[in-house]
Amino acid sequence: MEQMSVTQFAGELKMPASVLLEQLQKAGVEKTGADQLLTEQDKARLLEYLRRSHGQSQPKGKITLTRKQTSEIRATDSSGRARTVQVEVRKKRVFMKRDEVSAETGSLESAQIEEETAGLPMGEIEPTPEPENIVEPVAEAIPEPEPVREPEPEPEPIVEPEPEPEPEPEPEPQPEPEPRPEPEPATVESGAPAKPEAPVRAPSRPPLRVSILSDEERAAREREARRHQELRARQAADLKAKQDREAAARAAAEARRAEEEARVRAEAERRAEAAKPQPKEAAKAPAGTLHRPAKTEEKPAGKDAKRTARGDTAGESAKRRGLKTRGEVGATTGSWRGARGGGRRGAQDEHKSFQAPTEPVVREIHVPETISVADLAHKMSVKAAEVIKILMKMGSMVTINQVLDQETAMILVEEMGHKAFAAKLDDPDTYLESAEAHHDAAVEPRAPVVTVMGHVDHGKTSLLDYIRRAKVASGEAGGITQHIGAYHVETPRGMLTFLDTPGHEAFTAMRARGAKATDIVILVVAADDGVMPQTREAIHHAKAANVPLVVAVNKIDKPDANPDRVKQELVAEGVLPEEYGGDVMFINVSAKTGVGIDSLLEAVLLQAEVLELTAPVDSPAKGLIIEARLDKGRGPVASLLVLSGTLRKGDVMLVGATFGRIRAMLDENGKAIDHAGPSIPVEVLGLSDVPAAGDEAIALADEKKAREIALFRQGKYREVKLAKQQAAKLESMFEQMAEGEVKTLPLIIKADVQGSQEALVQALNKLSTDEVRVNAIHSAVGAISESDVNLAQASGAVIIGFNTRADAGARKLAETFGVDIRYYNIIYDAVDEVKAALSGMLAPERRENVIGLVEVRQVFKVPKVGTVAGCYVLEGVVKRGSQVRVLRNHVVIHNGELESLKRFKDDVKEVKFGFECGLSIRNFNDVQEGDQLEVFEIQEIARTL
């Protein structure tokens, strides 16, 4: 072996060289310098000294080896995903000397036997004090020379940590006692090499072994084994008794719970029997089925016993394998993972041991306006497949995501045995109702809202122009009103608010909105024209709204004016003047000259005084959207008539499915205002989208609540719209299958305001017939955009712009794609052109036109040609290729076509009246003399709507 210096050895031991030199000198090794070399004997002496000083003079009796092995396995977790788990296996092996093994298996009696052998020589007994480490009494009983060594541990407590690693590596490479394998083959490396006492220890063991295996020791071992066996048996008996007690307690608890449930059910059945006396036998049945819980008494106990036994076996096998586990992971409480299989079943059995026959559960289902099949199934707690089956039996083929309307859903719920209610449980509109109930502001008189109605061209706008001293009518396209206008006028007797409605038949919805918001209706009738269709419609609107009428007979300055005839016609419509005993005032006026205008205003104000119109002023505003449009620069603009309260700039408004904070308010002249009271018409800016004309507007204090209600309404309208579209698609599909293909004219309609848009769509849809149909793919308010052109190109539609124009990008795109864009300012022109286009799509009418009559004089049979008839033209003309009808005795026997026409031997195109000719009929040879041939042509005549 290589020798090393004191400095090198100190470096290995991680200690100063000076300290090591001191320890070497105390151990009897004469080393004075750090560069001197150390031999193996010097190291052994130092080791022996250190052991003596720390009370470990004797060699180690046992060696412990620990081995750690790490590996990886792939396992699935509770969610089913594969995971890599690191497994660390630690093995610990203890090697002991044979005499130590025998000493450990013995009890305290073995120590006494060793005391008896104390007469042996001291050198033989001295090497065997190993039992000292295990049994303390032996060390006290033998007066060994250990007390002499005890005073030596005083020096260097500092060195105590350093020499600890030294003894461990030292004993293993030196298995010096080679002569010993014969007496002790089981002994592995001894713990004390290089000791002079080691050879003396070998002969001392056989006599010691003989003394240990004596009869007394054997008897002592048997007694100890019996005692351990009795102890284990007693512990097993206690454990079994405890398990039996727990199982019996559980079984008793189950039985008590089952009896209690049976008693409660029997009581319920008895009460039900008292309420309806028919099912008497059924009520007795639960009381008689008390044998069922009795059966379940032993069942849990048996299962628990089996489970316990299984758990014990599993635990023992796990211990035998020596694997480190997380412990019991069965169905015990507090375990980190639920039990697999049986554990969960056991837990369920404890709770569900008793089940009485259940009656079908009848639920109260609140059905909204629209609901999907899946949501409805969830409400009824059934699978969606069951709902689809019932719907298929009812004749509807649906999918799980299909939306059902309220009526169908309620029928389905009743069909499945539940109770259906039409409900709006989560409707935030209830917030508005509760908010209205809390506002009890003082009411004040307000100005009347007057709507001017009548037939087109009867002078409504001209009448208002004279009252307002304005010239609106002269600036309107075509001289007709196509928008609803709102104006307020100050008169000496008070303020009046006028609504001017269109008179054209297409604007029915506008007139209905005007009647809804009004207090008084002025019915304008031209004295030279009388009562017309829209006049009658205006009367109906006024009566439906329960609004008083004032009739203005206009154009009395014309020569052919006849006010009395107008009165008679209105009486026929149920409008009685005051002079006839009615309650309607008739005023003769002329919007051109101003005759009777003051009398008309006085009559209106008188009627308003009778009505005593009032409205709260200091409260949140409520109003009605008269008209709405999309302005390119300002966004959505809504014309609003305030009905009650005061509307201020900055208020949060909720209008139908739109909301927003008012950024600006304008009066009818375009001037900015800050607030508007009752009966004042204003234009508001700041809404999130273009509202629908006729929607009710309300001012709210909470913008968050306004947004919530608007979004709810949007979702509701969308669901209803989708449900209607789906139904319409199915209906139209069946219609097309039944009637054949219907030609459609796809249109995209863009208008300046909402009212014009809906009026135009309605007027164009009225043009549809069974053969041709107008399909308004998209209709909206605003300018024609590129998205409209793209949609038109994809669907092959024509774009109609009513009082709007296409922007530059849209025009360029339309030229590229060849999309047709038509602009109109007058609704008549738009309707007429679409009508003409639909007429062109109609299949032409086929009409027969008889052009001649010929008589067969002679018949010739020509080979390879067939029958040729020699004829005389009695009337008209005969043309080659014309259709002919063969008449025999004035009865039609054949319809066909002329194949050839000849005069003498020449082919001719036609033969006129009074000439003879020869002809043959295609695929017909049964021509006889005396037959007459009627020659005709089929003309196609274009149809109109």
UniProtKB/Swiss-Prot annotation:
InterPro entries, alphabetized: DNA-bd_dom_put_sf (IPR009061), EF-G-like_DII (IPR053905), EFTu-like_2 (IPR004161), IF2_assoc_dom_bac (IPR013575), IF2_II (IPR044145), IF2_N (IPR006847), P-loop_NTPase (IPR027417), Small_GTP-bd (IPR005225)
Region (G3): 500-503
Region (G4): 554-557
Record region (Disordered): 52-80, 96-357
Record's compositionally biased regions (Acidic residues): 153-175
Region (G2): 479-483
Keyword terms of this UniProt record: Cytoplasm, GTP-binding, Initiation factor, Nucleotide-binding, Protein biosynthesis
Major location (coarse): cytoplasm
GO MF term set: GTP binding; GTPase activity; guanosine tetraphosphate binding; translation initiation factor activity
Presence of the UniProt keyword Nucleotide-binding in the record: yes
Domain (tr-type G): residue spans on this chain: 445-614
Comp. bias intervals (Basic and acidic residues): 215-283, 294-310
Stored Pfam families: EF-G_D2, GTP_EFTU, GTP_EFTU_D2, IF-2, IF2_assoc, IF2_N
GO CC annotation: cytosol
Sequence segments annotated as region (G1): 454-461
Keyword Acetylation: no
Region of interest called G5, as start-end residue ranges on this chain: 590-592
Subcellular localization: Cytoplasm
Ligand binding (GTP): 454-461, 500-504, 554-557
Entry similarity comment: Belongs to the TRAFAC class translation factor GTPase superfamily. Classic translation factor GTPase family. IF-2 subfamily.
Cross-referenced HAMAP family: IF_2_B
Functional note: One of the essential components for the initiation of protein synthesis. Protects formylmethionyl-tRNA from spontaneous hydrolysis and promotes its binding to the 30S ribosomal subunits. Also involved in the hydrolysis of GTP during the formation of the 70S ribosomal complex.
Name under which the protein is recorded: Translation initiation factor IF-2
